[in-house]
From Swiss-Prot:
Native species: Escherichia coli (strain K12)
Lineage per the UniProt record: Bacteria, Pseudomonadati, Pseudomonadota, Gammaproteobacteria, Enterobacterales
Family matches, as CDD domains: S1_EF-P_repeat_1, S1_EF-P_repeat_2
One GO location term (cellular component): cytosol
Protein name: Elongation factor P-like protein
BP term (GO), one: peptide biosynthetic process
Length: 190
């Protein structure tokens, strides 16, 4: 069984009789000598959908669950439900808007390549996106003529409604690459 410091976002733990999907991990390194690094993890309870927070020391042993990953394409929206189709056997997977609220901020209209659904024992758990996505800037302060590629940033609203910090020289209409997990600008899209 893995230690807490080996757990990554998207894994599922069997903890206190609950199946918990890892949504976020904060690492807290104390400055005192001999103190252990703490891992504050935010989970979503697979069965109830409730949010759960737990803290672990780096050497705590945790029980992980092996998941089945299937590549899917976005199919259609039906009211409050988003339907994805398995690329191999065309099985439909349905999520409510609340279940994939975070992921929708990064999903351009029509979906994106390399999306996966996570299932365990036939139960649908989560939608997993690739590491990066290319999105268009729809609103930001105008680019400054002659602005250097300095560290000065400005907020930009993207085509999905997501707001991130981008360099000063970018303007509306440009496509940029975003690192999904860190919600940060990586560069202009190809």
């Amino acid at each position: 069984m893995p230690r807490a410091n080996e757990i990554k976002k998207g894994m599922v733990l069997n903890y206190n009789g609950k199946l918990l999907l890892v949504k976020d991990i904060d690492i807290q390194s104390p400055t005192a000598r001999g103190a252990a690094t703490l891992y504050k993890m935010r989970f979503s309870d697979v069965r109830t959908g409730l949010k759960v927070e737990e803290r672990f020391k780096g050497d705590d042993i945790v029980d992980t669950v092996t998941l089945t990953r299937r590549y899917v394409d976005f199919s259609y929206v039906d009211g409050n439900e988003y339907v994805f189709m398995d690329k191999e056997d065309y099985t439909p997977y349905t999520f409510t808007k609340d279940q994939i609220e975070e992921e929708l901020l990064f999903m351009p209209e029509g979906g994106m390549p390399d999306m996966q659904v996570l299932t365990w024992d036939g139960q649908l758990l989560a939608l997993e996106l690739p590491q990066t996505v290319d999105l268009e800037i729809v609103e930001t302060a105008p680019g400054i003529k002659g602005a250097s590629a300095s560290a000065r940033n400005k907020p930009a609203t993207l085509s999905t409604g997501l707001v991130i910090q981008v360099p000063e020289y970018l303007s509306p209409g440009e496509k940029i690459r975003i690192h999904i997990e860190e919600r940060r600008y990586m560069g202009r899209a190809d």
